C-alpha cells in the first residue's frame, strides 16, 4: 500500500514538473512558454551557413597544400567526413 502511494506521488511530482513551464491552447496543444511560433527561433541563415562552410573548405585546402600543416590533416578529414584530396581550388571546381 505504501509503495502504491509513493509511486503515485512520484508520478504526480514528475508530471507537475514537466508541465509547469508549459501552457495549453486549445488549437495548438501544449507549448513551452505562453505562445508558440511556427518558425524556429534560432537558426542559421542559408547564406551565412554557405559562407562558413566555404571558409572551412578553403582553409582545409590551404592546409592540405601546405607541407608544414601535415599533422592536422587527419583530424580535419575525420571532422568533415569526406575525401579532402583537392587537386584544384574550390572556386575552380564550379
Swiss-Prot record:
Primary location group: secreted
InterPro entries (alphabetical): AKH/RPCH_hormone
Record's signal peptide: 1-21
Domain of life per record: Eukaryota
Pfam families attached to this UniProt entry: Adipokin_hormo (PF06377)
GO BP terms, alphabetized: neuropeptide signaling pathway
One GO cellular component, as annotated: extracellular region
Site (Cleavage): residue numbering on this chain: 34-35
This protein's UniProt keywords: Cleavage on pair of basic residues, Neuropeptide, Secreted, Signal
Location in the cell: Secreted
GO molecular function, one term: hormone activity
Function noted in UniProt: Neuropeptide involved in reproduction. May be an important hormone in the regulation of gonadal maturation.
Name of the featured protein: Prepro-gonadotropin-releasing hormone-like protein
Species per Swiss-Prot/TrEMBL record: Ruditapes philippinarum (Japanese carpet shell)
Amino acid at each position: 500500500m505504501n509503495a502504491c502511494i509513493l509511486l503515485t506521488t512520484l508520478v504526480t511530482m514528475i508530471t507537475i514538473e514537466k508541465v509547469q513551464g508549459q501552457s495549453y491552447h486549445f488549437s495548438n496543444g501544449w507549448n513551452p512558454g505562453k505562445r508558440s511560433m511556427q518558425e524556429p527561433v534560432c537558426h542559421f541563415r542559408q547564406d551565412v551557413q554557405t559562407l562558413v562552410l566555404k571558409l572551412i573548405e578553403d582553409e582545409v585546402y590551404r592546409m592540405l597544400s601546405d607541407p608544414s600543416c601535415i599533422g592536422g590533416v587527419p583530424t580535419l578529414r575525420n571532422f568533415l567526413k569526406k575525401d579532402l584530396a583537392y587537386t584544384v581550388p574550390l572556386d575552380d571546381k564550379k
